[in-house]
């Protein structure tokens, strides 16, 4: 490959302007073709910031690799709020259900070190602490303890590896 460009774009909403245009302009690739391909591959993340890597050759060919959005962005998108709490241990901005936590954990699982959705959910819950988001009406750390104690086995049962 002749080069690599890494950018964050709004899912399904990339355009030839910044940050893509200035990065792609000096390269041999068709900028609009790259933009269209990025939008096709990121439309499921509509509006959420998504990391994208573009590898290109001197002949104008290119490959696009779409990453998973940051955990905080997935949580904000799932719960529909803009910014986390300035005082996350004192002021809470949203409450997440166990089902919503599972949804975010499943989306993020490929990027995490967790080996199943239950453990991915515990990692996502850690981000909830930083954002000031409660889970099932309580602090995310308390939720993780309850999850370890099996209180949410019904929600995460299908995520367990087959025995």
From Swiss-Prot:
InterPro entries: Ribosomal_uL11, Ribosomal_uL11_C, Ribosomal_uL11_C_sf, Ribosomal_uL11_CS, Ribosomal_uL11_N, Ribosomal_uL11_N_sf. Gene3D superfamilies: Ribosomal protein L11, C-terminal domain (1.10.10.250), Ribosomal protein L11/L12, N-terminal domain (3.30.1550.10). One of its GO terms (cellular component) is large ribosomal subunit. GO terms for biological process: translation. Residues 1-25 are annotated as: Disordered. Keywords: Ribonucleoprotein, Ribosomal protein, RNA-binding, rRNA-binding. It comes from the Archaea. This is Large ribosomal subunit protein uL11. The gene is rpl11.
């Amino acid at each position: 490959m002749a080069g690599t460009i890494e950018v964050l774009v709004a899912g399904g909403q990339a355009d030839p302007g910044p940050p893509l245009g200035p990065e792609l302009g000096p390269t041999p690739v068709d900028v609009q073709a790259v933009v269209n391909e990025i939008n096709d591959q990121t439309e499921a993340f509509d509006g959420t910031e998504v990391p994208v890597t573009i590898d290109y050759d001197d002949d104008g060919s290119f490959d696009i690799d779409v990453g998973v959005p940051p955990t905080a962005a997935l949580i904000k998108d799932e719960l529909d709020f803009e910014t986390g709490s300035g005082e996350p241990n004192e002021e809470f901005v949203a409450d997440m259900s166990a089902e919503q936590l599972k949804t975010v954990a499943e989306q993020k699982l490929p990027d995490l070190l967790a080996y199943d959705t239950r453990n991915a959910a515990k990692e996502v819950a850690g981000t909830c602490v930083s954002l000031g988001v409660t889970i099932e009406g309580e602090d995310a750390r308390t939720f993780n303890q309850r999850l370890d104690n099996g209180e949410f086995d019904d929600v995460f049962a299908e995520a367990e590896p087959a025995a």
